[in-house]
């Protein structure tokens, strides 16, 4: 993270020129962001939009905002926060500098992001599913308008991008980079009915706490990891595993020995690639010193002096000393989002941005799908998302997981089969197809 941001924010506060935010989506991530932004000088929340206006107002009140500050129409005082179900109205507010998109709905997110661009607003996008679908097209549109478009710091993709950037700036070769999660073979078939057992949670307690079964299903079945690693590949230029993520059961001590290429004794197909590691092994047993909530980068060197420094300065290395791992064992989601807001609002720089269309997250059947079955999309009963190189996905006519919801099968699809456009009746929304075609014209081919 860039040093000096807090001092600059304090100066903006003193000068009466705070970075003014409109938040679209007041769910878990948005609620965390609300709590923290209220504590930061130089950042001012001026609008919250959510289809559930009661949820938006509750999130603000729970964060300590007085009822008198909530404006359900036009602002009535200088410190009013507009609360609305109309995202477009919140985005259009003249004094908004940065829009935070946090709905979690990829198609809605694309619409909101493009509305923000049309209104001349910078955007921090929390809805990573939109970036996996059309991120490079969105970043290109922002650049053409002189605007900043950014991944959300606090989510794992932006934190991984930070580690990769650190490694490259300091002259290290990036061997692999990725995230931790909870996954083992068979978890890809997880449904909302089985998710709490797989996740290790009591179903009654999880439901009582209001946890979203579909969201947690997407975590457990591997879809969310595939989406996030697709975005990391797009933002960093790292390659995508041809067979999809391996979800290797690896603790932090084994990162440099396992997350290196096969020719060097590891388990990766090549150097310079994304991957995910699991906190449990194939039998469901816990991995020692797991990285379930964290992120990592493995760097390599052929320079014996650099390898010696890896050892002398306490890095975890493989037995050769040529590969070393650095990691962060947590991520604080919406509680860290103001890092992106400050970086975008003060410097006009993103905390990671999708650039190249090198990765795709495609839909794979979780069960046998009969003809005319409606696909329920990410985190549902019918499909999970698998990471693929973009050129492979297009050559096979694969349906992206972000466009799968609501489609109907035109023929029987067997469990484990890739869902292709020939398997369904529809072709997806016209505006999204246009954006995707613009990416295909600049597709990046994985080595």
Range-by-range predicted roles:
Residues 1-115:
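N-terminal glycine-/serine-/threonine-rich beta1-alpha1-beta2 phosphate-ribose binding loop
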Residues 2-11, 198-447:
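C-terminal catalytic/substrate-binding lobe primarily of soluble NAD(P)-dependent oxidoreductases
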Residues 51-53, 104-105, 127-131, 154-155, ...:
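Short, ordered loop/turn segments at secondary-structure junctions
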Residues 54-55, 130-135, 139, 156-160, ...:
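Short gly/pro/ser/thr-enriched loop/turn and capping motifs at secondary-structure boundaries
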Residues 60-61, 135-138, 161-164, 179, ...:
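Short acidic, glycine/serine/threonine-rich loops at helix termini
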Residues 103, 107-119, 127-148, 152-155:
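Rossmann-fold NAD(P)-binding glycine/threonine-rich loop
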Residues 142-143, 150-220:
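Rossmann-like NAD(P)H-binding beta-loop-alpha module
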